[in-house]
Every structure is written in structure tokens, then in C-alpha cells.
Amino acid sequence: MSHPALTQLRALRYCKEIPALDPQLLDWLLLEDSMTKRFEQQGKTVSVTMIREGFVEQNEIPEELPLLPKESRYWLREILLCADGEPWLAGRTVVPVSTLSGPELALQKLGKTPLGRYLFTSSTLTRDFIEIGRDAGLWGRRSRLRLSGKPLLLTELFLPASPLY
């Protein structure tokens, strides 16, 4: 099962440098904190619509593979993050199987919990980079994050109803 927003997320073209954009737009795109929290600050109830979750092989993550360790399997989670039931963001998380040990096993059991609620409660969370991307007028970003030094890649596409626009 897929969703058109996730197809568009995978088509994002990334900027080599941070583009000169409106400061309010950059504030959203370069946010270091939880996007879930930012959406809740808009006075909205945030929920997750699960699109796909499970183990995949390298051939299913061609866009992410160069940014992650080469492994036999990866945990893939694709969701829509909704505010008061309206989709504001499409998210795709790719986690190498080697990351899924110790406390990070919880990444497989998030269910309808937003990823940000888990990630941003961890004292071991670090971010290697944020890249800004665009496709067909929609903005997105991807970040390589680390929990206890173990990598995962998060890609987010801001949907038309998002307050980013």
C-alpha cells in the first residue's frame, strides 16, 4: 500500500546548500525540535495515519541507501501526520537493522505514536544534517538522526494544508 504524498516525498530534489528563502519558511524547514510539537503548538490535535511499516531490503530504499550503513534489512515506516484529522506532513523513516537494539527496539513498536514523541525524549538524540528539498511546489526535508550514535533517516514532506505555506 502506498499514498500519493509518499510518492511525491520520494521525488524530492535536495538543495546542495540552504536556499535563500523567507525566514518563516526556513524556520519550519530547519526546525531542530519535534515537528509533532510544532504542530501541537498550532493548537491542533496531532495523530498518525499509518501507511506502511515493516522490514524492507536495500532495493526498496534507493534514495536513502547512500546515507545509511549497508545492511541486509531496514525498518521502514511511512505515515501521514495529521492535525485535527487533516494531513499536514508525509513522513518516511528508514532504520538500519543494527540500530534496532537496546532501547531503540522501541522504533518498531511506535504504532500510531508520532516519531517525534519518541525521538525528542531521548537524551542520546543527535542530528548529523538537515537537507531541504522541493518537488512540484511542495517543500520537504531529510535528516540523519542518531540515537546512542546509531543512525536513522527521516524524510518529511509538508503537505498543502500545512501551516508552512
UniProtKB/Swiss-Prot annotation:
UniProt cross-references to Gene3D superfamilies, sorted A to Z: Chorismate lyase-like
SUPFAM superfamilies in UniProt: Chorismate lyase-like
Pathway per the UniProt entry: Cofactor biosynthesis; ubiquinone biosynthesis
Main localization of the protein described in the UniProt heading: cytoplasm
Effect of G91A: Increases the inhibition by product by about 40%. No effect on substrate affinity
Gene Ontology MF terms: chorismate lyase activity
Subcellular localization, as worded in the UniProt entry: Cytoplasm
EC top class named in words: lyase
Gene Ontology biological process terms in this record: pyruvate biosynthetic process; ubiquinone biosynthetic process
Annotated substrate binding sites: M35, R77, L115, E156
pH sensitivity of activity: Optimum pH is 7.5.
Oligomeric form and interacting partners: Monomer.
Role played: Removes the pyruvyl group from chorismate, with concomitant aromatization of the ring, to provide 4-hydroxybenzoate (4HB) for the ubiquinone pathway.
Other remarks in the entry: The sdgG mutation, which suppresses a conditional mutation in dnaG (DNA primase), has been localized to one of the ubiA, ubiC or yjbI genes.
Protein name (Swiss-Prot/TrEMBL): Chorismate pyruvate-lyase
Source organism of this protein record: Escherichia coli (strain K12)
Lineage, broadest ranks: Bacteria, Pseudomonadati, Pseudomonadota, Gammaproteobacteria, Enterobacterales
